[in-house]
C-alpha cells in the first residue's frame, strides 16, 4: 500500500537565522492512528475480516482480451480486509485529526524557497501504512539592511562626499554583528567594497562562505550651512583649475561635439 499523504508547511526566518542555522517549532494538524481502535478501523471487541473477493490480497486480476490486468479490489478498496463493525470515533477510517507541534532543525545557509523534508511527519497511513513526509518551505523576513545574492550579502552604505574623497573607517552592520569597514580614499559612488567571509555559509558545504558586498553611495546634502557653502565654493574654484582625468575627457568631448 502507498504511504500516507505528505503535508506542507511554511516557515519564515530572519537572514541572521539563515546564516547561523536555527530550530523552529511548527504547529500543524495531521492525520494519526485513531486512539480508540489503534488504527484498525474496527470497533472495540471486533476485528476486520478477510475480504472474500480478493482473499485478503487487496488486488484482483481482470482479463482484457489476451491480457490480465491487476487492479485494486473494488470490494475492500485494496485493503484486503472489510470492517463490518466500524469504530465510531473514526468511522472505520483508522485515522483521526490531531493538532501537533513538531520541532525542526534548519541548517546554516538555507536558501529562500528551499524545501526541507522531514521524513514520516506527514499524515499517517491507515492500517499500518507508513506515514508521509512533512515538507517545510523556507521564506525570509524582509531585512532593514541586507539582501541575499547567492551566498553573498548585499548592503548599501551611504557616505558623505568628504568620507569618499578622504577615506574613512566606518562601523557597519553584518550578519554577525557590528564590524569596521575601511572606505579607501577616492572611493567612487556605486563602487563595491568586499568584506570577505562575512556572507552566508553554503548549505552544501560549511567550509565555503560568501562575502558581504557593500555598495557605496555618495550622499549629496539638499541643504548646507553657510560655513559648508563657503568651503564648497572654495573647492569649486580649485576644481576649475585642477580637473580630474575623467572629467577632463568629458569636457574635451563636449567641446569637440559642439564645435
Where do the PLM segments sit?
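Charged, often glycine-enriched C-terminal and inter-domain segments
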Residues: 3-23, 66, 81, 85-89, ...
Amino acid at each position: 500500500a502507498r504511504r500516507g499523504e505528505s503535508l506542507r508547511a511554511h516557515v519564515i526566518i530572519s537572514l541572521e537565522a539563515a546564516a547561523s542555522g536555527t530550530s523552529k517549532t511548527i504547529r500543524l494538524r495531521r492525520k494519526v492512528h485513531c486512539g480508540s481502535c489503534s488504527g484498525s478501523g474496527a470497533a472495540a471487541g471486533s476485528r476486520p475480516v478477510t475480504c472474500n473477493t480478493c482473499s485478503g490480497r487487496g488486488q484482483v486480476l481482470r482479463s482484457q482480451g489476451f491480457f490480465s490486468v491487476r487492479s485494486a479490489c473494488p470490494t475492500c478498496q485494496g485493503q484486503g480486509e472489510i470492517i463490518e463493525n466500524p469504530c465510531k470515533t473514526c468511522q472505520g477510517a483508522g485515522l483521526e485529526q490531531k493538532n501537533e507541534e513538531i520541532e525542526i532543525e534548519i541548517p546554516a545557509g538555507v536558501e529562500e524557497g528551499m524545501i526541507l523534508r522531514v521524513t514520516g511527519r506527514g499524515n499517517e497511513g491507515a492500517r499500518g501504512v507508513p506515514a508521509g513526509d512533512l515538507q517545510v518551505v523556507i521564506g525570509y523576513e524582509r531585512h532593514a539592511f541586507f539582501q541575499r545574492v547567492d551566498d553573498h550579502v548585499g548592503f548599501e552604505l551611504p557616505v558623505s562626499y568628504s568620507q569618499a574623497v578622504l577615506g574613512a573607517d566606518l562601523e557597519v552592520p553584518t550578519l554577525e554583528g557590528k564590524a569596521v569597514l575601511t572606505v579607501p580614499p577616492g572611493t567612487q559612488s556605486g563602487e563595491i567594497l568586499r568584506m570577505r567571509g562575512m556572507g552566508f555559509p553554503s548549505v552544501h558545504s560549511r567550509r565555503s562562505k560568501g562575502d558581504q558586498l557593500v555598495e557605496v553611495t555618495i550622499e549629496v546634502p539638499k541643504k548646507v550651512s553657510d560655513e559648508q557653502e563657503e568651503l564648497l565654493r572654495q573647492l569649486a574654484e580649485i576644481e576649475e583649475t585642477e580637473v580630474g582625468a575623467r572629467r577632463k575627457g568629458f569636457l574635451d568631448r563636449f567641446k569637440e561635439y559642439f564645435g
